[in-house]
Amino acid sequence: MTDVRFRIIGTGAYVPERIVSNDEVGAPAGVDDDWITRKTGIRQRRWAADDQATSDLATAAGRAALKAAGITPEQLTVIAVATSTPDRPQPPTAAYVQHHLGATGTAAFDVNAVCSGTVFALSSVAGTLVYRGGYALVIGADLYSRILNPADRKTVVLFGDGAGAMVLGPTSTGTGPIVRRVALHTFGGLTDLIRVPAGGSRQPLDTDGLDAGLQYFAMDGREVRRFVTEHLPQLIKGFLHEAGVDAADISHFVPHQANGVMLDEVFGELHLPRATMHRTVETYGNTGAASIPITMDAAVRAGSFRPGELVLLAGFGGGMAASFALIEW
Protein backbone atom coordinates (compact mmCIF):
# COMPACT_ATOMS: atom_id res chain seq x y z
CA MET A 1 0.00 0.00 0.00
CA THR A 2 1.36 3.39 -1.00
CA ASP A 3 0.60 7.02 -0.25
CA VAL A 4 0.83 8.74 -3.64
CA ARG A 5 -0.69 12.22 -3.26
CA PHE A 6 -1.32 13.79 -6.62
CA ARG A 7 -4.36 15.40 -8.17
CA ILE A 8 -6.73 14.31 -10.89
CA ILE A 9 -7.17 17.45 -12.97
CA GLY A 10 -9.18 16.04 -15.87
CA THR A 11 -11.03 12.93 -17.02
CA GLY A 12 -12.27 11.72 -20.39
CA ALA A 13 -13.74 8.68 -22.11
CA TYR A 14 -14.51 7.25 -25.52
CA VAL A 15 -16.74 4.40 -26.63
CA PRO A 16 -17.23 3.29 -30.25
CA GLU A 17 -20.38 4.23 -32.13
CA ARG A 18 -21.60 0.70 -32.86
CA ILE A 19 -24.18 -0.54 -30.34
CA VAL A 20 -24.39 -4.33 -30.06
CA SER A 21 -27.60 -5.71 -28.56
CA ASN A 22 -27.96 -8.82 -26.44
CA ASP A 23 -29.89 -10.52 -29.22
CA GLU A 24 -27.10 -9.85 -31.72
CA VAL A 25 -24.29 -11.08 -29.51
CA GLY A 26 -26.29 -13.92 -28.00
CA ALA A 27 -27.55 -15.61 -31.16
CA PRO A 28 -24.24 -17.30 -32.18
CA ALA A 29 -23.76 -18.39 -28.56
CA GLY A 30 -27.24 -19.89 -28.26
CA VAL A 31 -28.60 -17.47 -25.63
CA ASP A 32 -31.15 -14.66 -25.72
CA ASP A 33 -31.63 -11.21 -24.23
CA ASP A 34 -33.44 -12.51 -21.16
CA TRP A 35 -30.67 -15.01 -20.32
CA ILE A 36 -27.91 -12.41 -20.70
CA THR A 37 -29.75 -9.80 -18.63
CA ARG A 38 -30.50 -12.26 -15.82
CA LYS A 39 -26.94 -13.58 -15.68
CA THR A 40 -25.02 -10.33 -16.17
CA GLY A 41 -27.25 -7.27 -15.94
CA ILE A 42 -25.83 -6.17 -19.31
CA ARG A 43 -28.31 -4.87 -21.89
CA GLN A 44 -25.95 -3.71 -24.63
CA ARG A 45 -22.31 -2.92 -25.34
CA ARG A 46 -20.21 -0.96 -27.85
CA TRP A 47 -17.86 -2.65 -30.32
CA ALA A 48 -15.16 -0.95 -32.34
CA ALA A 49 -15.29 -0.47 -36.09
CA ASP A 50 -13.12 -2.71 -38.25
CA ASP A 51 -10.60 0.08 -38.83
CA GLN A 52 -10.22 0.95 -35.13
CA ALA A 53 -7.50 -0.40 -32.85
CA THR A 54 -6.96 -0.02 -29.11
CA SER A 55 -4.69 2.99 -29.63
CA ASP A 56 -7.45 4.81 -31.52
CA LEU A 57 -9.84 4.41 -28.60
CA ALA A 58 -7.12 5.38 -26.13
CA THR A 59 -6.16 8.47 -28.12
CA ALA A 60 -9.75 9.72 -28.23
CA ALA A 61 -10.16 9.27 -24.47
CA GLY A 62 -6.79 10.92 -23.86
CA ARG A 63 -7.75 13.94 -25.94
CA ALA A 64 -10.97 14.32 -23.96
CA ALA A 65 -9.10 14.17 -20.65
CA LEU A 66 -6.49 16.69 -21.79
CA LYS A 67 -9.25 19.07 -22.88
CA ALA A 68 -10.95 18.72 -19.50
CA ALA A 69 -7.63 19.35 -17.74
CA GLY A 70 -6.87 22.40 -19.85
CA ILE A 71 -3.36 21.31 -20.80
CA THR A 72 -1.66 20.42 -24.07
CA PRO A 73 -0.03 17.10 -25.01
CA GLU A 74 3.37 18.82 -24.97
CA GLN A 75 2.98 19.47 -21.24
CA LEU A 76 2.82 15.75 -20.44
CA THR A 77 5.76 14.05 -18.76
CA VAL A 78 4.50 10.48 -19.11
CA ILE A 79 1.72 8.45 -20.74
CA ALA A 80 0.73 5.07 -19.31
CA VAL A 81 -1.77 2.89 -21.15
CA ALA A 82 -3.35 0.02 -19.25
CA THR A 83 -4.44 -2.63 -21.75
CA SER A 84 -4.46 -6.37 -22.30
CA THR A 85 -5.52 -5.99 -25.94
CA PRO A 86 -2.61 -4.03 -27.46
CA ASP A 87 -2.50 -2.96 -31.09
CA ARG A 88 0.40 -5.38 -31.57
CA PRO A 89 2.58 -7.47 -29.22
CA GLN A 90 5.26 -4.84 -29.88
CA PRO A 91 5.72 -1.87 -29.71
CA PRO A 92 3.70 -0.58 -26.74
CA THR A 93 0.29 0.80 -27.55
CA ALA A 94 1.25 3.90 -25.55
CA ALA A 95 3.84 4.75 -28.21
CA TYR A 96 1.08 4.97 -30.84
CA VAL A 97 -0.98 7.12 -28.48
CA GLN A 98 1.97 9.44 -27.86
CA HIS A 99 2.43 9.88 -31.61
CA HIS A 100 -1.28 10.37 -32.33
CA LEU A 101 -1.53 13.01 -29.60
CA GLY A 102 1.61 14.80 -30.71
CA ALA A 103 3.13 14.48 -27.23
CA THR A 104 6.71 14.69 -28.50
CA GLY A 105 9.34 13.87 -25.88
CA THR A 106 6.88 12.25 -23.50
CA ALA A 107 7.75 8.87 -21.99
CA ALA A 108 5.13 6.27 -22.90
CA PHE A 109 4.63 2.69 -21.73
CA ASP A 110 1.98 0.01 -21.33
CA VAL A 111 0.77 -1.75 -18.19
CA ASN A 112 -0.89 -5.16 -18.49
CA ALA A 113 -2.73 -6.05 -15.32
CA VAL A 114 -5.86 -6.98 -17.29
CA CYS A 115 -9.00 -5.47 -15.74
CA SER A 116 -7.08 -4.11 -12.72
CA GLY A 117 -4.73 -2.25 -15.01
CA THR A 118 -5.79 1.38 -14.68
CA VAL A 119 -5.06 1.60 -10.95
CA PHE A 120 -1.77 -0.26 -11.55
CA ALA A 121 -0.93 2.36 -14.18
CA LEU A 122 -1.97 5.17 -11.88
CA SER A 123 0.43 3.85 -9.24
CA SER A 124 3.19 3.37 -11.83
CA VAL A 125 3.30 7.03 -12.87
CA ALA A 126 3.57 8.30 -9.30
CA GLY A 127 7.36 8.00 -9.21
CA THR A 128 7.72 9.87 -12.49
CA LEU A 129 5.62 12.73 -11.17
CA VAL A 130 7.68 12.86 -7.97
CA TYR A 131 11.07 12.88 -9.68
CA ARG A 132 10.33 14.71 -12.92
CA GLY A 133 7.22 16.73 -12.15
CA GLY A 134 4.76 17.80 -14.80
CA TYR A 135 1.64 15.87 -15.76
CA ALA A 136 0.76 12.25 -16.43
CA LEU A 137 -1.90 10.83 -18.73
CA VAL A 138 -3.23 7.49 -17.52
CA ILE A 139 -5.47 5.61 -19.95
CA GLY A 140 -7.35 2.35 -19.60
CA ALA A 141 -8.26 0.97 -23.03
CA ASP A 142 -9.38 -2.43 -24.26
CA LEU A 143 -10.85 -3.85 -27.44
CA TYR A 144 -12.04 -7.27 -26.39
CA SER A 145 -14.40 -7.81 -29.31
CA ARG A 146 -11.38 -8.93 -31.39
CA ILE A 147 -10.43 -11.79 -29.05
CA LEU A 148 -13.85 -13.24 -28.21
CA ASN A 149 -15.12 -16.62 -29.37
CA PRO A 150 -18.59 -15.83 -30.74
CA ALA A 151 -19.84 -19.26 -29.70
CA ASP A 152 -18.69 -19.00 -26.05
CA ARG A 153 -21.63 -17.71 -24.05
CA LYS A 154 -19.48 -17.40 -20.90
CA THR A 155 -17.39 -14.61 -22.43
CA VAL A 156 -18.82 -13.13 -25.62
CA VAL A 157 -21.88 -11.66 -23.89
CA LEU A 158 -19.80 -9.80 -21.30
CA PHE A 159 -17.41 -7.54 -23.12
CA GLY A 160 -17.53 -4.17 -24.80
CA ASP A 161 -14.82 -1.91 -26.21
CA GLY A 162 -13.83 1.49 -24.88
CA ALA A 163 -11.28 3.74 -23.23
CA GLY A 164 -11.17 6.07 -20.26
CA ALA A 165 -8.47 8.49 -19.18
CA MET A 166 -7.25 10.71 -16.34
CA VAL A 167 -4.75 13.55 -16.31
CA LEU A 168 -2.73 13.66 -13.11
CA GLY A 169 -0.67 16.50 -11.70
CA PRO A 170 1.10 17.45 -8.47
CA THR A 171 -0.90 18.55 -5.44
CA SER A 172 0.51 22.06 -5.94
CA THR A 173 -1.66 22.49 -9.05
CA GLY A 174 -4.50 24.32 -7.34
CA THR A 175 -7.66 22.51 -6.34
CA GLY A 176 -9.13 19.20 -7.37
CA PRO A 177 -9.42 15.61 -6.21
CA ILE A 178 -6.34 14.10 -4.56
CA VAL A 179 -5.34 10.45 -4.95
CA ARG A 180 -4.49 9.69 -1.33
CA ARG A 181 -3.57 6.03 -1.39
CA VAL A 182 -3.32 2.98 -3.65
CA ALA A 183 -2.90 -0.74 -3.06
CA LEU A 184 -2.00 -3.46 -5.58
CA HIS A 185 -2.36 -7.24 -5.17
CA THR A 186 -1.50 -10.19 -7.42
CA PHE A 187 -2.34 -13.86 -6.84
CA GLY A 188 -0.08 -15.60 -9.33
CA GLY A 189 -1.22 -19.08 -8.38
CA LEU A 190 -4.51 -18.32 -10.15
CA THR A 191 -3.13 -17.37 -13.57
CA ASP A 192 -5.19 -19.99 -15.40
CA LEU A 193 -8.54 -18.54 -14.34
CA ILE A 194 -8.39 -15.78 -16.98
CA ARG A 195 -6.20 -16.22 -20.03
CA VAL A 196 -5.59 -16.04 -23.75
CA PRO A 197 -3.83 -19.41 -24.16
CA ALA A 198 -1.77 -18.84 -27.32
CA GLY A 199 0.08 -16.00 -28.98
CA GLY A 200 2.93 -15.55 -26.51
CA SER A 201 6.36 -17.07 -25.99
CA ARG A 202 5.04 -20.05 -24.03
CA GLN A 203 2.69 -21.09 -26.81
CA PRO A 204 3.14 -19.27 -30.13
CA LEU A 205 0.00 -19.16 -32.23
CA ASP A 206 0.15 -21.59 -35.14
CA THR A 207 -2.45 -23.18 -37.39
CA ASP A 208 -3.19 -25.91 -34.84
CA GLY A 209 -3.78 -23.25 -32.20
CA LEU A 210 -6.06 -21.31 -34.51
CA ASP A 211 -8.06 -24.45 -35.27
CA ALA A 212 -8.42 -25.06 -31.53
CA GLY A 213 -9.49 -21.47 -30.83
CA LEU A 214 -6.52 -20.76 -28.58
CA GLN A 215 -6.37 -17.16 -29.78
CA TYR A 216 -9.57 -16.39 -27.89
CA PHE A 217 -10.06 -15.03 -24.38
CA ALA A 218 -10.98 -17.82 -21.95
CA MET A 219 -12.23 -17.69 -18.39
CA ASP A 220 -13.25 -20.05 -15.60
CA GLY A 221 -16.28 -17.98 -14.69
CA ARG A 222 -17.29 -19.93 -11.61
CA GLU A 223 -13.84 -19.71 -10.02
CA VAL A 224 -13.44 -16.05 -10.98
CA ARG A 225 -16.75 -15.28 -9.30
CA ARG A 226 -15.65 -17.21 -6.21
CA PHE A 227 -12.38 -15.28 -6.06
CA VAL A 228 -14.14 -11.93 -6.37
CA THR A 229 -16.94 -12.58 -3.87
CA GLU A 230 -14.68 -14.25 -1.30
CA HIS A 231 -11.55 -12.08 -1.50
CA LEU A 232 -12.49 -8.63 -2.75
CA PRO A 233 -14.60 -7.53 0.25
CA GLN A 234 -11.87 -8.55 2.70
CA LEU A 235 -9.14 -6.87 0.66
CA ILE A 236 -11.14 -3.66 0.51
CA LYS A 237 -11.84 -3.72 4.24
CA GLY A 238 -8.12 -4.17 4.88
CA PHE A 239 -7.29 -1.31 2.51
CA LEU A 240 -9.66 1.06 4.28
CA HIS A 241 -8.38 -0.02 7.71
CA GLU A 242 -4.76 0.66 6.77
CA ALA A 243 -5.78 4.01 5.29
CA GLY A 244 -7.47 4.92 8.58
CA VAL A 245 -10.83 5.31 6.88
CA ASP A 246 -14.12 3.94 8.16
CA ALA A 247 -16.48 2.27 5.71
CA ALA A 248 -19.09 4.87 6.61
CA ASP A 249 -16.75 7.61 5.34
CA ILE A 250 -16.88 6.35 1.73
CA SER A 251 -19.36 8.32 -0.36
CA HIS A 252 -18.78 6.72 -3.77
CA PHE A 253 -17.72 3.27 -4.96
CA VAL A 254 -16.41 2.89 -8.52
CA PRO A 255 -15.64 -0.79 -9.18
CA HIS A 256 -14.49 -2.59 -12.29
CA GLN A 257 -17.66 -3.24 -14.29
CA ALA A 258 -17.24 -6.99 -14.66
CA ASN A 259 -20.80 -8.23 -14.34
CA GLY A 260 -23.77 -6.35 -12.93
CA VAL A 261 -25.11 -9.25 -10.90
CA MET A 262 -21.70 -9.92 -9.34
CA LEU A 263 -21.27 -6.23 -8.50
CA ASP A 264 -24.48 -6.31 -6.49
CA GLU A 265 -23.17 -9.29 -4.52
CA VAL A 266 -19.84 -7.61 -3.77
CA PHE A 267 -21.42 -4.28 -2.84
CA GLY A 268 -23.74 -6.05 -0.43
CA GLU A 269 -20.78 -7.65 1.34
CA LEU A 270 -18.84 -4.39 1.68
CA HIS A 271 -21.30 -2.66 4.01
CA LEU A 272 -20.56 0.86 2.80
CA PRO A 273 -23.66 2.45 4.36
CA ARG A 274 -23.37 5.90 2.75
CA ALA A 275 -21.81 4.96 -0.56
CA THR A 276 -23.30 5.17 -4.02
CA MET A 277 -22.08 2.46 -6.40
CA HIS A 278 -21.53 3.90 -9.87
CA ARG A 279 -22.30 1.66 -12.86
CA THR A 280 -21.93 1.64 -16.61
CA VAL A 281 -22.01 -2.13 -17.09
CA GLU A 282 -25.63 -2.13 -18.24
CA THR A 283 -24.91 0.05 -21.27
CA TYR A 284 -21.23 -0.60 -22.01
CA GLY A 285 -20.62 -4.11 -20.68
CA ASN A 286 -17.25 -5.13 -19.29
CA THR A 287 -14.71 -2.83 -20.95
CA GLY A 288 -11.68 -4.34 -19.23
CA ALA A 289 -9.12 -1.82 -17.99
CA ALA A 290 -11.30 0.95 -19.39
CA SER A 291 -14.27 0.28 -17.14
CA ILE A 292 -13.13 2.20 -14.05
CA PRO A 293 -12.06 5.39 -15.86
CA ILE A 294 -15.14 5.29 -18.14
CA THR A 295 -17.42 4.97 -15.11
CA MET A 296 -15.52 7.62 -13.19
CA ASP A 297 -15.73 10.05 -16.10
CA ALA A 298 -19.48 9.47 -16.37
CA ALA A 299 -19.86 10.31 -12.68
CA VAL A 300 -17.69 13.42 -13.04
CA ARG A 301 -19.77 14.66 -15.96
CA ALA A 302 -22.97 14.00 -14.02
CA GLY A 303 -21.67 16.14 -11.15
CA SER A 304 -21.92 13.21 -8.74
CA PHE A 305 -18.79 13.92 -6.69
CA ARG A 306 -18.76 16.76 -4.15
CA PRO A 307 -15.74 18.45 -2.51
CA GLY A 308 -14.54 16.55 0.54
CA GLU A 309 -16.17 13.26 -0.42
CA LEU A 310 -14.14 10.04 -0.50
CA VAL A 311 -14.25 7.92 -3.66
CA LEU A 312 -13.08 4.29 -3.67
CA LEU A 313 -11.87 2.72 -6.92
CA ALA A 314 -11.67 -1.09 -7.01
CA GLY A 315 -10.18 -3.09 -9.87
CA PHE A 316 -10.00 -6.87 -10.17
CA GLY A 317 -9.23 -9.30 -12.95
CA GLY A 318 -6.74 -11.64 -14.57
CA GLY A 319 -3.63 -12.57 -12.70
CA MET A 320 -5.62 -12.84 -10.53
CA ALA A 321 -5.12 -9.25 -9.44
CA ALA A 322 -6.85 -6.55 -7.43
CA SER A 323 -6.16 -2.84 -7.13
CA PHE A 324 -7.64 -0.04 -5.06
CA ALA A 325 -7.37 3.73 -4.95
CA LEU A 326 -8.73 6.18 -2.41
CA ILE A 327 -9.52 9.62 -3.81
CA GLU A 328 -10.50 12.68 -1.79
CA TRP A 329 -12.68 14.89 -3.96
Curated annotation (Swiss-Prot):
Q: Which GO terms describe its biological process?
A: fatty acid biosynthetic process; isopentenyl diphosphate biosynthetic process, mevalonate pathway; secondary metabolite biosynthetic process
Locate the transmembrane regions by residue number. Answer: none
Q: Where is the active site?
A: C115, H256, N286
Signal peptide span per the entry? Answer: none
First-tier enzyme category under EC:
transferase
Which reaction equations make up its catalytic activity?
malonyl-CoA + acetyl-CoA + H(+) = acetoacetyl-CoA + CO2 + CoA
Q: Does the keyword Acyltransferase apply?
A: yes
EC numbers listed for it are 2.3.1.194
Q: What is the effect of changing H256A?
A: 40-fold decrease in activity
* Record-level Gene Ontology MF annotations: 3-oxoacyl-[acyl-carrier-protein] synthase activity; acyltransferase activity, transferring groups other than amino-acyl groups
Q: What pathway is it annotated to? A: Metabolic intermediate biosynthesis; (R)-mevalonate biosynthesis
Query: Is Cytoplasm given among the entry's keywords?
Result: yes
For this UniProt record, give its keywords in alphabetical order, as a comma-separated list.
Answer: Acyltransferase, Cytoplasm, Transferase
The subunit structure is: Homodimer.
| Function as written in the Swiss-Prot or TrEMBL entry | Catalyzes the condensation of acetyl-CoA and malonyl-CoA to form acetoacetyl-CoA and CoA. Does not accept malonyl-[acyl-carrier-protein] as a substrate. Can also convert malonyl-CoA into acetyl-CoA via decarboxylation of malonyl-CoA.
Which family does the record claim for this protein? Belongs to the thiolase-like superfamily. FabH family.
Recorded hits in NCBIfam families, A to Z, give: PRK09352.1
Question: Which protein, by its recorded name, is this?
Answer: Acetoacetyl CoA synthase NphT7
Q: Which organism is it from?
A: Streptomyces sp. (strain CL190)
Tell me the classification of the organism that encodes this protein: Bacteria, Bacillati, Actinomycetota, Actinomycetes, Kitasatosporales
